[in-house]
């Protein structure tokens, strides 16, 4: 196998997106389009990967980091001009170069690997990735000769009646002999209506020099979808969503309603987990086996242990242990660590808190900037008062603590192991171990007060 290189074209402005966001950074199933392409291309055993950037170059470089080298196309003068920007990095290399657009998020490593192998086995100087479609209007047609090699690529507007009947189309993805590619780029002319340098002209140049130009036809036309506007973006989203859901179901995950379930491409879900409708799983979330998620639940960049149930709730950037029950209508905010066999009930919000094994907050509580021990019971309406208008303060609750209903813990404060806090208390000082703390006004009953008040009003 020869050395392999790839050039990703990601310099276009994307005017038809009508967006402030650079086109290739628009997400599909939670991941930028160009990141999808890079993730797949990176599986091909490349020696070098070059991404050609233009508009929004800094943001694309920030997204991709050091997985790619970058070449700048400061002025967009066509696809051949874009590839030529990578000359300083690749022109002297021996091997095969894949050229692909950064707005094709559905392309898979398997299809690109098949294209590369076909190219190498055919002994071609260039190979075009093609597809067969029943309605090819608007696409460039592949005209083959009697040997099955590519004779030319004809744009729809330039095709004659015979060529218009061809249903094999150019997808815009190519393989080239690297040296032949960069030698040909210098020969491409911009003598056309747009005054731009087009990559398909390299095919004509190589063909004219007597080189073999081959074509590899993929069975998966959907993979070649280029996203140029919001309509195509939504189409890519649906296709990717279905692909991700199918993969999870094949791997043993039950998805009750795949059409109403949204799972990130980077999410990992264990077998025998059930996903209910309206669930959104984002980022690099990891969910264990035998879990029940949803309905109407959002989980982002979090780790969920085996056997955990999360209903009608939101979990962000947190870790939840095994056999935990969350919801309905709970909110686990970033930097929270929930232990095993924990109960986080309805209308409970937890933020930046370590919540120990076996502890419970079953209803109507806010727990923020806290450290909760094991086997703690937080009664209905328990609140950690963590903010004084300027700074956040920590609440520490030891093991086996019982907090009565409607209690306020004014941080910084510590309730030591085994202590009890009476219902309705506002705790402003530390509570010793095993102590009962009562911090509320003493009840006063005024006998016959109501009758006296009403008689007084009548008189």
Swiss-Prot record:
Signal peptide: none annotated. Acetyl-CoA binds at residues 386-387, 423, 440. Residues 252-459 are annotated as: N-acetyltransferase. Its cofactor is Mg(2+). Mg(2+) binds at residues 103, 228. UDP-N-acetyl-alpha-D-glucosamine binds at residues 9-12, 23, 73, 78-79, 140, 155, 170, 228, 333, 351, 366, 377. Transmembrane segments: none annotated. Its EC number is 2.7.7.23, 2.3.1.157. InterPro entries: Bifunctional_GlmU, GlmU-like, GlmU_C_LbH, Hexapep, Hexapep_transf_CS, NTP_transferase_dom, Nucleotide-diphossugar_trans, Trimer_LpxA-like_sf. Pathway: Nucleotide-sugar biosynthesis; UDP-N-acetyl-alpha-D-glucosamine biosynthesis; N-acetyl-alpha-D-glucosamine 1-phosphate from alpha-D-glucosamine 6-phosphate (route II): step 2/2; Nucleotide-sugar biosynthesis; UDP-N-acetyl-alpha-D-glucosamine biosynthesis; UDP-N-acetyl-alpha-D-glucosamine from N-acetyl-alpha-D-glucosamine 1-phosphate: step 1/1; Bacterial outer membrane biogenesis; LPS lipid A biosynthesis. One of its GO terms (cellular component) is membrane. It is found in: Cytoplasm. Its main location: cytoplasm. Binds 1 Mg(2+) ion per subunit. It catalyses: alpha-D-glucosamine 1-phosphate + acetyl-CoA = N-acetyl-alpha-D-glucosamine 1-phosphate + CoA + H(+); N-acetyl-alpha-D-glucosamine 1-phosphate + UTP + H(+) = UDP-N-acetyl-alpha-D-glucosamine + diphosphate. GO terms for biological process: cell morphogenesis; cell wall organization; lipid A biosynthetic process; peptidoglycan biosynthetic process; regulation of cell shape; UDP-N-acetylglucosamine biosynthetic process. Catalyzes the last two sequential reactions in the de novo biosynthetic pathway for UDP-N-acetylglucosamine (UDP-GlcNAc). The C-terminal domain catalyzes the transfer of acetyl group from acetyl coenzyme A to glucosamine-1-phosphate (GlcN-1-P) to produce N-acetylglucosamine-1-phosphate (GlcNAc-1-P), which is converted into UDP-GlcNAc by the transfer of uridine 5-monophosphate (from uridine 5-triphosphate), a reaction catalyzed by the N-terminal domain. In the N-terminal section; belongs to the N-acetylglucosamine-1-phosphate uridyltransferase family. Homotrimer. NCBIfam families: glmU (TIGR01173), PRK14354.1 (NF010934). This is Bifunctional protein GlmU. The gene is glmU.
């Amino acid at each position: 196998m020869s050395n392999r290189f790839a050039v990703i074209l990601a310099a276009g402005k994307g005017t038809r997106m009508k967006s402030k966001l650079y086109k290739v950074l628009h997400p599909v199933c939670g991941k930028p389009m160009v990141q999808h392409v890079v993730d797949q291309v990176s599986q091909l055993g490349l020696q070098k990967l070059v991404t050609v950037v233009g508009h929004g170059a800094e943001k694309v470089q920030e997204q991709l980091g050091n997985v790619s080298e970058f070449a700048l196309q400061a002025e967009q003068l066509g696809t051949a001009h874009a590839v030529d920007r990578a000359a300083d990095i690749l022109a002297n290399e021996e091997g095969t170069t894949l050229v692909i657009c950064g707005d094709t998020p559905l392309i898979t490593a398997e299809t690109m690997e098949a294209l590369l192998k076909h190219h190498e086995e055919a002994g071609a100087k260039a190979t075009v990735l093609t597809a067969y479609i029943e309605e090819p209007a608007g696409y460039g047609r592949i005209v083959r000769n009697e040997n099955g090699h590519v004779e030319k690529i004809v744009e729809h507007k330039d095709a004659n009646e015979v060529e218009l009947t061809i249903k094999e189309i150019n997808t815009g993805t190519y393989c080239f002999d690297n040296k032949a590619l960069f030698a040909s780029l210098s020969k491409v002319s911009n003598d056309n209506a747009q005054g731009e340098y087009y990559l398909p002209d390299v095919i004509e140049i190589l063909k004219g020099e007597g080189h073999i130009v081959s074509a590899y036809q993929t069975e998966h036309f959907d993979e070649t979808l280029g996203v140029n506007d919001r309509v195509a973006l939504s189409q890519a989203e649906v296709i990717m969503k279905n692909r991700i859901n199918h993969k999870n179901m094949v791997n043993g995950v039950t998805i009750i309603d795949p059409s109403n379930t949204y799972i990130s491409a980077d999410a990992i879900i264990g077998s025998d987990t059930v996903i209910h409708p309206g669930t959104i799983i984002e980022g690099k979330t990891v969910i264990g086996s035998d879990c029940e998620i949803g309905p109407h639940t959002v989980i982002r960049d979090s780790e969920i242990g085996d056997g955990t149930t999360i209903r009608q709730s939101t979990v962000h950037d947190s870790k939840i242990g095994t056999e935990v029950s969350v919801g309905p209508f709970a909110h686990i905010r970033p930097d929270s660590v929930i232990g095993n066999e924990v109960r986080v009930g309805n209308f409970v919000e937890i933020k930046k808190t370590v919540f120990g094994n076996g502890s419970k907050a079953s209803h109507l509580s806010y727990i923020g900037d806290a450290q909760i021990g094991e086997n703690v019971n937080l009664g209905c309406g328990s609140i950690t008062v963590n903010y004084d208008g300027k700074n956040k303060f920590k609440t520490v609750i030891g093991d086996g603590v019982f907090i009565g209903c409607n209690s306020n813990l004014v941080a910084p404060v510590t309730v030591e192991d085994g202590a009890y806090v009476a219902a309705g208390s506002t705790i402003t000082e530390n509570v010793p171990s095993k102590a009962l703390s009562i911090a509320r006004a003493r009840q006063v009953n005024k006998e016959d007060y109501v009758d006296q008040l009403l008689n007084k009003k009548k008189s």
